């Protein structure tokens, strides 16, 4: 469990490390921050699409084994990204890196689904999320610090390659001690199609996956440009701007620490509704606040609200198809990161052409509506 959490740390850091680097990348290659956001977009798109490969592979060959192999792939590809000479080469390397990273967090969660009873799964996933959330915070901070440092984005990517290599080797060395689920019989596209049909045959899966897609578009897309927004609006250094937004992860850690009590006291429906309202209020505050320092406390509130919704979605996703849980979690991640890719493309265009107000107003209105719709559906299901 600890090694999987550390693996999730580095995978999550890769998702957020470029947020604070976008202005630096844009300056070095002579492009706008919105265009530089392509390094986030291609990572998310490849990450989402590759779920369709890693999910069935995890069910067939073992989830922990595939996580270790994916980590070593991330090590090699982050080095390739660090050595890229042009922006197109960097985009290609980030896309390949995202494809490899796709095998880490979702398969780790699927392993938890195999090994932990449902009644204990939400608190267990919350503890696992400490690794994921800490990685997001560290990635955000590292991106800002390296953006203001001489090594720039190349140094950030090299540091991540070192971490990937260490964790990947340790995990593969520990495989014989890790509990595994019986493999899904057969191989090839026929089995893959059968597993996907198993997931989608459950009507509740469509609701969970649809809300997850919306979360990716409305939340994760605009989040990528928040350091650039604070840098542009208030003149903050990229390290300070990234540090303020990184407090988002602290809100997630607060959730993880109290997850068991929150589930018992509120129930899933109330958690989801409250989370959506907190996220909407946070984006509104980022848009309207006249001073920079409020961005940090607002990020904490948004982070807490995010995980009230997101961890509930994850827990429901582990039950979409217990017989093909790797594929189910891969489909969940495909929707989340496919949504992020769409969101980054739309938010980048808004940031460059229409202003940050549009970029922030849409999630301020949309996230509460999405969360309330899921809360209502959850109550009906109960």
What are these regions (language model features)?
Residues 73, 88-96, 293-301:
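Paired small-residue
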Residues 176-208:
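Juxtamembrane intracellular "pre-TM" segments in multi-pass secondary transporters
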Residues 30, 62, 83-89, 235, ...:
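Helix-breaking motifs and short loop linkers at transmembrane-helix boundaries and internal kinks
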């Amino acid at each position: 469990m600890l090694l999987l959490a550390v693996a999730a740390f580095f995978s999550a850091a890769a998702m957020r490390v470029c947020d604070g680097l976008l202005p630096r990348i844009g300056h070095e290659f002579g492009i706008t921050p919105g265009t530089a956001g392509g390094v986030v977009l291609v990572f998310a798109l490849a990450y989402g699409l590759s779920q369709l490969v890693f999910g069935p592979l995890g069910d067939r060959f073992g989830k922990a084994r595939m996580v270790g192999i994916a980590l070593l792939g991330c090590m090699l590809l982050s080095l390739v990204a660090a050595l890229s000479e042009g922006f197109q080469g960097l985009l290609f390397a980030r896309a390949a890196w995202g494809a490899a990273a796709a095998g880490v967090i979702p398969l780790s969660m699927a392993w938890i689904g195999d090994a932990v009873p449902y009644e204990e799964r939400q608190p267990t996933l919350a503890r696992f999320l400490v690794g994921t959330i800490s990685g997001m915070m560290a990635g955000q901070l590292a991106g800002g610090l390296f953006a203001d440092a001489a090594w720039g984005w190349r140094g950030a990517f090299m540091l991540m390659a070192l971490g990937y290599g260490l964790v990947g080797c340790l995990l593969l060395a520990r495989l014989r001690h890790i509990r595994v689920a019986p493999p899904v019989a057969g191989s090839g596209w026929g089995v893959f199609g059968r597993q996907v049909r198993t997931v989608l045959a459950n009507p509740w899966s469509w609701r969970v996956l649809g809300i997850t897609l919306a979360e990716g578009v409305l939340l994760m897309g605009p989040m990528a440009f928040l350091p650039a927004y604070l840098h542009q609006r208030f003149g903050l250094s990229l390290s300070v701007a990234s540090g303020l937004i990184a407090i988002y992860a602290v809100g997630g850690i607060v959730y993880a620490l109290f997850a068991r009590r929150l589930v018992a006291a509120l129930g899933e429906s109330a958690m989801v509704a409250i989370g959506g309202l907190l996220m909407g209020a946070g984006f509104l505050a980022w848009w309207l606040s006249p001073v920079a320092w409020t961005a940090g406390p607002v990020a904490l509130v948004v982070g807490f609200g995010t995980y009230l919704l997101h961890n509930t979605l994850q827990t429901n996703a582990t039950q979409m198809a217990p017989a093909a849980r790797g594929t189910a979690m891969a489909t969940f991640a495909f929707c989340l990161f496919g949504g992020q890719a769409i969101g980054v493309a739309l938010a980048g265009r808004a940031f460059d052409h229409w202003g940050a107000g549009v970029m922030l107003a849409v999630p301020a209105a949309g996230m509460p509506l999405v969360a309330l719709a899921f809360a209502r559906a959850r109550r009906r299901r109960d």
